[in-house]
Each structure stands twice: as structure tokens, then as C-alpha cells.
A protein has these predicted regions:
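Active-site rim/loop-helix segments in enzyme catalytic domains that contact anionic ligands
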Residues: 1-119, 146-150, 241, 251, ...
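Metal-dependent de-N-acetylase/amidase catalytic core
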Residues: 1-3, 90-271
Length: 271
């Protein structure tokens, strides 16, 4: 079970493992907490600009999410329907109805109920405060951790993590391909961000080979066309995409299997 903040996060952060484990016959569940209302509108208009309709954006993004999950062969998709909170420096995050302001007792309770229903051996979500502090990502982390704690069902809890060298390799391969890195992520690649990424890298326990399903991850990303149609995600040459995104890396935060780390399989010790 992967607990995500917005439509498209399932593909960018865990598309490889979702596709790989689905191909291995493992039941996969994606929980998407928000509708992504504050994503781009038509012609990439931003929230607050003329032509941006949050409700229509949500409708479009949820349809794209369904398509992406079909490409990744996700067994079950669960959408919680909470309202996108927007970026950390946007005023929307202060609205009482957005996901990051919904009481943890409520949102974690809903995810805990899904954990009880599907009884996943492995639960995956984001890392806590660190390099990327989007309010909805932080809340999804809190919700998933609390759901795991309440139920005691997952044998393993993982946090999504990228290595500093992955970001540096991304920048190199984009330059080689003549693709300008937009902001974000260009604005994120500050010395402080890279320092935090290096700290995160030291905590990584698990590296999963996803080269065999990289094309499906890319196709799933392309399904989110309203957000990514001209994105570097989909413009990257095939060999560069495989080089940078042929692995997905995680921090094993909780474990009841006793399996040693480092490991190369989220299900190590469970089969």
C-alpha cells in the first residue's frame, strides 16, 4: 500500500515498484489523499490566475490518476477526496478545509480503516520534514505513520527517499539532452537542499531495481498530461530516463521481519 498526497505522485515516486510488484502478482493499493485542485489548469494556468478552475482541475487529475494506475496495474485505487493545500509558501495552506488542516484523528482514521481492509504487508509513504516540505506530503507522512501505529498490521514501513547523487545525475543528463531544468526543481537544488539530500541518502536502506518497468513508469507519468505534457519527465531521452529512474530508493522505518539491511526488495523477509 502506497499513501500519496496528489494525483501523479504515485507515478513519480513509486511508479517503478508499483509496476514491478504488480507484475510479480502482488496486490498493490494506492491511496491518494487529495484531488490536486491546485495543480495546473488549461494551458498550465496557475491557481489564482484567470482560467484556473480548481474543481475542473480536480476532475481532470482524478481521471488521469485512474489511467496511470491502470498502466501500473494497480489492484486497488482509493481516493480520500481531501482538498489540495497548495505549496508551503501559498496562502491556501491556511484554509481550514484543506488536507493539511484536517484533524489527524480523522484522516489517519480513514487510512487506518483501509489498512484494516487490505491488510498490507508493506506500507510506503513519504519521509518526514526535510528536503521537500510540501504541506500535503508532510500530512500524508503523518497519516500513514499513525495508521501503521494504530493498526500494527504492516510488517514493514518505508519512506520514499532520493539520493543526492540522483538529483545531481538528473541535472547532468538534462544538460546533456539540452533540456532546461524548470523551477521547481531547479529552485530546489540549493546548497541547503543538497545538504539535506545527503543526510537523507545516509538513511537509505533499500534500493529496488525498476529498470524492467521503467517504460511503464514513464507511460504512467505521461498519463498525467494536464500537469506533465511538456515536462522534463516525459521529454527526457529514453536512455537518460533509465539511467536516472531505473531504481527507486527507500528508508526502512519500521520492520517486524528481522531482515538485514541494506536490501533490494520491499518484500524481503515476507516471501
Amino acid at each position: 500500500m502506497a499513501v500519496h498526497a496528489h494525483p501523479d505522485d504515485e507515478s513519480s515516486s513509486t511508479g517503478g515498484v508499483l509496476a514491478r510488484y504488480a507484475d510479480e502478482g502482488i496486490t498493490t493499493v494506492v491511496v491518494t489523499c487529495t484531488n490536486g485542485e491546485y495543480g495546473d489548469g488549461p494551458d498550465h494556468v496557475k491557481p489564482g490566475e484567470a482560467g484556473h478552475d480548481p474543481d475542473q482541475v480536480a476532475k481532470t487529475r482524478l481521471a488521469e490518476l485512474e489511467t496511470a494506475c491502470q498502466i501500473l496495474r494497480v489492484t486497488h485505487l482509493e481516493t480520500l477526496g481531501y482538498h489540495d493545500s497548495g505549496m508551503a509558501d501559498w496562502a491556501y495552506k491556511d484554509d481550514g478545509h484543506v488536507f493539511s488542516n484536517v484533524p489527524l484523528e480523522e484522516s489517519a482514521g480513514r487510512v487506518a480503516a483501509l489498512v484494516e481492509r487490505y491488510r498490507p504487508d508493506v506500507l510506503v509513504t513519504y519521509d518526514g520534514p526535510g528536503a521537500y516540505n510540501h504541506p500535503d506530503h508532510l500530512r500524508a507522512h503523518e497519516v500513514a505513520v499513525e495508521a501503521s501505529r494504530r493498526t500494527g498490521i504492516p510488517a514493514k514501513l518505508y519512506f520514499i527517499a532520493r539520493r543526492r547523487r540522483d538529483w545531481e545525475r538528473l541535472r547532468e543528463r538534462m544538460a546533456e539532452a539540452g533540456i532546461e531544468m524548470p523551477a521547481p526543481p531547479a529552485a530546489m537544488l540549493t546548497p541547503e537542499f543538497l545538504r539535506r539530500m545527503e543526510e537523507t541518502e545516509q538513511r537509505i536502506t533499500t534500493t529496488v531495481d525498476t529498470t524492467g518497468v521503467a517504460s511503464r513508469k514513464r507511460d504512467a507519468l505521461a498519463a498525467h498530461a494536464s500537469q506533465l505534457d511538456q515536462s522534463w519527465w516525459v521529454r527526457f531521452p529514453d536512455d537518460a530516463f533509465l539511467d536516472v529512474f531505473g531504481q527507486e530508493t527507500f528508508i526502512r522505518a519500521e520492520d517486524r521481519t528481522g531482515e538485514p539491511v541494506p536490501e533490494d526488495d520491499l518484500f524481503a523477509g515476507l516471501r
